[in-house]
């Protein structure tokens, strides 16, 4: 038996602003948006009674590849003054298969994201042994999560 990792939930400062970023940059859609009170047991953040809001966004599937945005409403969760400028141990790297890597980067830039790497052409040998020509770029979202965005341009036989 193999389990599916269906969602990654991110702590965000402003749920609406974060959701709009994912909707505009990657074309994701809101799947769920609900307030809830923490039990103080299962989640290793906050404490019992904290009022939060969970927004879940989906791309092409409603079982895998979803992103949750968790905002503390009361009390507000303290956020760092400065967002990361490099990836540290323990921080996730989100890898996106995009139909338009250049467009995603420009949309992210327009919404205020910090850009790490402008679109560049590169090649990789896939698990099937075929060489794939790619366009890749990378940037941070508005809460400091890092995204590597890749677009397959051509698969060689």
Mark where each language-model region is.
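Core segments of cupin and vicinal oxygen chelate
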Residues: 11-64, 110, 130, 154
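A cross-kingdom feature marking solvent-exposed beta-strand/loop segments within repeated
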Residues: 35-42, 77-80, 120-128
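Vicinal oxygen chelate
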Residues: 1, 9-10, 33, 67-68, ...
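Short, charged/polar surface micro-motifs in flexible loops or helix N-caps
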Residues: 62-64, 75, 101
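Glycan-recognition patch characteristic of GH18 chitinases/ENGases
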Residues: 83-84
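Exposed loop/turn and edge beta-strand positions of beta-sandwich/beta-sheet ligand-binding modules
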Residues: 4, 50-51, 90, 133
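Residue-level detector of short, conserved catalytic/binding motifs and their immediate flanks
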Residues: 6, 55, 92
């Amino acid at each position: 038996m193999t389990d599916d990792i269906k969602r990654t939930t991110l702590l965000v400062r402003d749920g609406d602003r974060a959701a709009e970023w994912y909707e505009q940059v990657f074309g994701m859609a809101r799947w769920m948006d609900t307030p809830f009170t923490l039990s103080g047991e299962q989640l290793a953040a906050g404490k019992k009674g904290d009022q939060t809001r969970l927004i879940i966004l989906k791309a092409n599937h409603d079982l895998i590849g979803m992103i949750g945005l968790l905002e503390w409403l009361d009390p507000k969760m303290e956020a760092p003054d400065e967002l990361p400028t490099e990836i540290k141990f323990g921080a996730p790297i989100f890898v996106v298969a995009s139909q338009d890597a250049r467009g995603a980067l420009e949309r992210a830039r327009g919404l205020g994201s910090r850009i790490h790497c402008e679109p560049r052409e590169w090649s990789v040998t896939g698990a099937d042994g075929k060489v794939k020509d790619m366009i890749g770029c990378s940037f941070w979202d508005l809460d400091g999560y890092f995204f590597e965005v890749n677009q397959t341009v051509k698969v060689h036989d």
